[in-house]
A protein has these predicted regions:
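Conserved small-residue
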Residues: 1-588
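Hydrophobic, aliphatic-enriched repeat segments that assemble into extended interaction scaffolds
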Residues: 504-507, 593, 604
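Short hydrophobic-aromatic micro-motifs
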Residues: 543-545, 600-603
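Short active-site loop/helix that positions an aromatic residue
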Residues: 589, 602-607
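Duplex nucleic acid-engaging cores and interfaces of nucleic-acid transaction enzymes
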Residues: 594, 599
């Protein structure tokens, strides 16, 4: 759904016009229609959008929260505000045109490139030939001058800089008016805050939306608060989702997080006498082994997602990578028949109701209140943000490497030749065999629709599928040569295809099941230096690399081991790898990874 984007300085200016009409910032054309060209940002399908529509219909008693034009959906009840420019005494309103603060370009009439009202300069066009200068040049003040037959800009006063526009009462506290609707500050995501954007909302919707997104938390004036974290938490429901699923409060079992504490010899960085100094020494390592992950029973997973091993779920103050697990089978095998046998908190009255196991690290509300309060406040609709996916190369069997990893491995020239040899062989086959080229471009020839041909590439794709003799034409040769040049260019940038994939990390999942019934003894099931992945052969050495690859230390050499218990109780795909963080420095080696896929994806390669 598209939403309006506006500059803070324009909102400020149109809300402080000398001849203001009360309608504020104008989003309409001269004909009175909404100018959808200004709607350049999108409000993703999310829990926020679902709730916004619901609240709007309750308040206004109608169903026009959004409108459609040419197949696209728009809403004017949320506005994305940017703070890119300061508000100046004279603001640019087009090429070489300046308009005084408090006025709009449409309100001025330039005569010989200048507009003066009651001996006050309102607008001016600079660097253009003037037939005759204005009779009283003092109206130019210290902002403009007249020389060589043209008006020139020589200075400008800043009324409010970008920071002041953000903090100024006019926006954050008083809000602004747009198209006759009052808007107030709503929220911003961590990504938006980095680029200085913020969402504003129709004031009539704000109170109910804010009460909902904060789970009724009451933050008092002067109360100590990690504001950056709080803003991030209330923005969890604005994340784009692909689907929803229903989880009832009684389906939850909340267990304690577990921290593995041990010592390891690492290269540590310390601050000494005003300098950062790196030293190899023994440090105490703390790993939260269930950080950011949950276990979800297979029966709760929607049918179309049952073949995935992980679903990233969001709700109010909840964010967790939820791994496909046979929780009820675990309870049955361990003779757990009553909720009193569980090692955690639940609202369930019967053991069969337990469908998801999580920890306080996934429930952000626990930083402000209790898990019991959160369970009583949440609605059963959870958003599915994403799931693990195979790569696009060779049906997920290959993964594209990158120059950071190649530099980390410090390969010799001979090693590099060995690494590139399969790629060169493949390029040679693409050059010489049209069937392999067809496979490479991966075009669905059996489902070719009879549609207009919109590009040269599409013509090539379809002709290759229709007649093999097309591979003997000059058009085919040109296409093939362009493709090969592109493949070689990718190799030069370090994008080498290797046997591997991107895998989401599942940390100590079986230990989490043990912890849920009180049998966890603090020991790892697979042991140090091992992983469990169905993607690779067992008893083989695997090289894992953090993605994104931040530094040369983001590599992990481990052994892939078989484990019948993991296979029995977890429904893992090839893109989920079971890892161990008990007594093993995996989290810091991978730069503080947790098990949410936003920062726990790891490229795996047989080595």
């Amino acid at each position: 759904m598209y939403i309006l984007t506006a500059e803070a300085k324009d909102l400020y200016n149109t809300n402080h016009l000398k001849n203001g009409n009360g309608s504020g910032y104008c989003i309409r054309t001269k004909a009175g229609n909404i100018n959808v060209k200004k709607f350049i940002n999108a409000l993703d399908y999310s829990l926020d959008l679902i709730k916004l529509r619901e609240i709007y219909e309750k308040i206004y008693r109608r169903h026009d929260f959004s409108f459609k034009i040419n197949g696209k959906e728009y809403t004017k009840h949320v506005i994305n505000v940017k703070f890119s420019y300061a508000q100046k005494e004279f603001n640019k309103a087009g090429n070489n045109i300046y308009v005084r603060s408090g006025y709009q370009y449409k309100d001025i009439k330039l005569e010989d490139h200048i507009c003066v009202v009651d001996d006050k300069l309102i607008g001016i066009e600079v660097d253009m030939e003037v037939d005759e200068p204005y009779k009283n040049l003092s109206v130019l003040e210290d902002y403009f001058t007249y020389e060589d037959g043209r008006y020139k800009n020589i200075g400008n006063d800043i009324i409010l800089n970008k920071s002041e526009l953000r903090q100024e009462l006019y926006l954050y506290e008083n809000g602004f008016v747009c198209d006759g609707i009052k808007y107030v500050r709503w929220k911003r995501s961590s990504g938006s805050s980095r680029v200085g954007k913020c969402l504003f909302i129709n004031e009539a919707l704000y109170q109910r939306m804010h009460k909902w997104e904060t789970c009724n938390l009451k933050i008092k004036d002067g109360q100590p608060l990690d504001l950056a974290a709080f803003e991030a938490y209330i923005s969890l429901t604005s994340s784009s989702i692909i689907d929803t699923l229903e989880i009832k409060p009684e389906n939850f079992l909340l267990i304690d997080d577990y921290e593995s504490v041990f010592k390891d010899t690492v290269v540590g960085v310390e601050f000494e006498e005003g300098h950062l100094v790196s030293k190899t020494k023994e440090y105490e390592i703390h790993n939260s082994i269930f950080d950011g992950e949950s276990l979800i029973d297979e029966s709760l997973v929607p049918d179309k997602y049952k073949h995935y091993g992980m679903l990233l779920l969001r709700n109010r103050f909840f964010k967790s990578a939820s791994f496909n697990c046979n929780i009820q089978q675990w309870f049955k095998d361990n003779n757990i028949t009553d909720t009193g046998q569980l090692n955690g908190f639940t609202l369930a009255q019967d053991i069969s109701e337990i469908k998801i196991i999580t920890t306080p690290s996934s429930i952000k509300y626990c930083k402000f209140g209790t898990a019991e309060q959160w369970l009583k406040l949440i609605e059963p609709t959870f958003g599915i943000v994403k799931h693990e996916k195979p790569t696009h190369y060779f049906n997920g069997r290959m993964v594209s490497c990158h120059y950071q990893l190649i530099n980390t491995l410090q390969l010799t020239e001979k090693d590099m030749q060995d690494l590139l040899e399969p790629s060169f062989d493949y390029i040679s086959k693409v050059r010489n065999d049209p069937a392999i080229l067809r496979y490479h471009i991966n075009y669905p020839y059996n489902e070719m629709p009879l549609t207009p041909l919109n590009s040269k590439n599409e013509i090539i794709f379809k002709l290759l599928g229709i007649n093999e003799n097309f591979s003997k034409t000059s058009l085919y040769y040109d296409f093939r040569d362009d493709l090969i040049r592109s493949m070689i260019r990718e190799l030069k940038q370090g994008h080498v295809l290797i046997n591997g994939n991107y895998s989401t990390l599942l940390g100590n999942g079986l230990e989490m099941l043990q912890h849920s019934i009180g049998t966890f003894n603090g020991e790892s099931v697979i042991g140090k230096g091992n992983i469990h992945s169905t993607r690779f052969e067992y008893d083989k050495t695997i090289l894992g690399s953090r993605s994104p690859h931040i530094c040369a230390g983001n590599v992990l050499v481990v052994k892939n081991v078989a484990n019948e218990e993991i296979d029995r109780y977890f429904n893992l795909s090839n893109e989920v790898v079971y890892v161990n963080a008990i007594g093993e420095n995996i989290q810091q080696r991978l730069n503080g990874c947790d098990y949410a896929p936003s920062c726990g994806d790891t490229g795996m390669k047989t080595w």
